[in-house]
């Protein structure tokens, strides 16, 4: 091996010095400038002594050389011998080069500084803020809902950490969400799985953390890695809410995140909502109203005045709020038996538009006994359901549907997906038939005999990207709508879509329910980030066990076409062992944003319910 020469060492040292950035380069430029000034001074004293006229010492010559180096234009005003003019001209040329280099270095250094700021690498100094880790379409729903939830606060903040450009994130949020009110949205570029990047978010001072499931393959692995990074941190650990795509990864995620993490199973939640919506028209709209911060919200209250009375009596206790259940030491129960006595350690679960609306009524509500109808519940009969298209959650949807229907029910699966109808062993009530079908083709749909079915579920085909899949779903819905109009067929339609912006287009099809799974999960994450104590309530709502939300014919509760107060509707439902929380006006079923659904009306509000209207209740199947 050859010996390193002095020249190589010097060059190596010089290269390392030059690579240290703008400050080092400016330092070298200063050295060159000093050398140039000294050289010009020496040459002037040697070749043109006594010039310019009136200069008597070395210091004055140094000053003149410095001025020529900094301002090359001074050469135009010089007078003297050829030697003096030549030296000054050379010094001015050298100065021109140095000044040009200096301007370039300063501009480049400023650009680098701006780029660093643009990348968003400074530490967040907020406190009591909500931290969002990761990026997906759900981030817009979450930010929008948190802005509404925190609108009453003087100062609130949302900090987002994702592997995206800071300015791009901020611009997308401004364009999609719009007015942010008093809430500051702070974006930082980094990897949520890296402890060093997590340190930028001031997690110790955060109120809650939301972990998003990213797009692409195996998103749960990414979420679990983030949970591990959060658990490894030292210091305070704020509550964490995380979304997982598959139920199979719940155990691993719980082990990684620990007790402070609440996990949302995206596929499971969306599957349950699709099944419930397919059987109870308007279910998705009710859930959206309960999950967002625009309509009715869920509150927990411990009113001492209600201790000792029954749950049935408590249904009439509030004027502008609706009791829906109890939170007991043993757990949450919605629509408990009407004779359940409220204990001192129980909390009443109510729906109200605002915290200030949760107040006890001044007196008893008037009930029109003559308007109450005691109709018997209709027995369950075997149903026929048509499932169009196939995706990864179709199997789960079918298994949940199997738990709802009575024995002898039929499910027809029509899709050209290679996995359609697979892995369905062990069904108890459903008989499943599978047909190969292009669900966008009118003749193929007509050959299915759609009019023979009571319910139609249109899934999003996972072989295509979200945008194209939604386009195909819209085509299918339009075909079904035209078939209903042309052939006079009647069946409920629930459809799954990806993009919330396509809901407005889908309204033309007059589908009974449009389930935007990403929006539902985003709303649920935002609710749990703000109200972690409601996790058990929402879990109960989406569970097939116990009471669920049902829109049932108004004629089964009160006389139709008659003016009645909503308290009369509540009493009619109470006598059936059900909790009434609202009604649906059939004439407004296609009018956004609530599609005819009125939740939590004032108990004294007078309503006239028609034959096609529904009462929305919490009831057992």
Residue ranges: model-predicted function:
Residues 1-621:
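Cytosolic regulatory regions of ion transport systems
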């Amino acid at each position: 091996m050859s010996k390193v020469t002095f020249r190589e060492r010097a060059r190596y040292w010089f290269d390392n010095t030059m690579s240290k950035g703008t400050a080092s380069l400016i330092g070298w430029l200063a050295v060159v400038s000093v050398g140039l000034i000294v050289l010009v001074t020496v040459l002037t004293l040697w070749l043109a002594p006594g010039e310019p006229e009136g200069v008597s010492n070395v210091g004055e010559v140094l000053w003149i050389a410095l001025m020529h180096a900094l301002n090359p234009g001074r050469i135009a005003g010089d007078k003297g011998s050829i030697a003096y003019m030549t030296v000054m001209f050379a010094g001015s040329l050298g100065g021109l080069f140095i000044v040009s280099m200096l301007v370039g270095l300063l501009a480049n250094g400023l650009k680098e500084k701006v780029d660093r700021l643009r990348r968003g690498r400074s530490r967040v100094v907020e406190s009591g803020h909500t931290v969002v880790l990761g990026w997906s379409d759900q981030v817009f729903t979450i930010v929008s809902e948190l802005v509404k939830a925190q609108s009453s606060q003087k100062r609130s903040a949302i900090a987002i950490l994702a592997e995206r450009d800071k300015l791009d994130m901020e611009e997308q949020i401004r364009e999609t969400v719009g007015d942010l009110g008093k809430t500051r949205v702070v974006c930082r570029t980094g990897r949520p799985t890296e402890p060093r990047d997590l340190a930028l978010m001031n997690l110790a001072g955060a109120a809650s953390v939301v972990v998003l499931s990213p797009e692409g393959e195996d998103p749960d692995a990414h979420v679990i890695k983030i949970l591990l990074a959060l658990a490894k941190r030292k210091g305070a650990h704020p509550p964490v809410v995380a979304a997982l795509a598959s139920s199979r990864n719940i155990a691993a995620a719980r082990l990684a995140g620990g007790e402070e993490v609440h996990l949302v199973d995206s596929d499971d939640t969306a599957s349950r909502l699709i099944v419930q919506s397919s059987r109870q028209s308007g279910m998705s709209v009710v859930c959206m109203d309960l999950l967002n911060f625009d309509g009715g919200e869920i509150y927990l209250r411990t009113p001492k005045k209600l201790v000792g009375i029954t749950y049935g009596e408590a249904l009439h206790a509030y004027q502008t709020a609706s009791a829906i259940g109890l939170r007991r030491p043993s757990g949450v129960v919605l629509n408990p038996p009407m004779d359940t006595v409220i204990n001192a350690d129980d909390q009443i679960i109510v729906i109200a538009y605002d915290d200030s609306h949760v107040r006890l009524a001044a007196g008893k509500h008037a009930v029109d006994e003559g308007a109450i109808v005691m109709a018997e519940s209709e027995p369950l009969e075997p149903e026929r359901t048509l499932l169009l298209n196939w995706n990864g959650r179709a199997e789960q949807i079918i298994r949940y549907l199997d738990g709802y229907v009575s024995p002898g029910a039929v499910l027809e699966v029509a899709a050209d997906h290679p996995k359609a109808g697979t892995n369905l062993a062990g069904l108890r009530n459903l008989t499943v038939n599978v047909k190969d079908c292009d669900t966008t083709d009118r003749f193929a749909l007509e050959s299915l005999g759609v009019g023979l079915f009571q319910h139609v579920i249109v899934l999003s085909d996972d072989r295509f990207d979200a945008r194209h899949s939604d386009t195909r779903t819209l085509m299918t819905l339009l075909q079904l709508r035209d078939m209903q109009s042309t052939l006079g067929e009647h069946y409920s339609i629930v459809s799954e879509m990806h993009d919330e912006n396509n809901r407005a287009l889908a309204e033309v099809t007059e589908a009974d329910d449009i389930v935007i799974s990403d929006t539902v999960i985003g709303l649920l994450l935002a609710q749990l980030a703000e109200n972690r104590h409601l996790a058990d309530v929402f879990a109960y709502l989406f569970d097939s066990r116990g009471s669920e939300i049902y829109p049932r014919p108004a004629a089964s509760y009160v006389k139709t076409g008659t003016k009645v107060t909503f308290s009369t509707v509540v009493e009619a439902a109470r006598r059936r062992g059900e909790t009434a929380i609202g009604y649906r006006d059939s004439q407004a079923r296609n009018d956004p944003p609530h599609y005819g659904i009125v939740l939590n009306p004032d108990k004294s509000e007078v309503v006239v319910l028609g034959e096609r209207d529904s009462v929305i209740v919490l009831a057992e199947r």
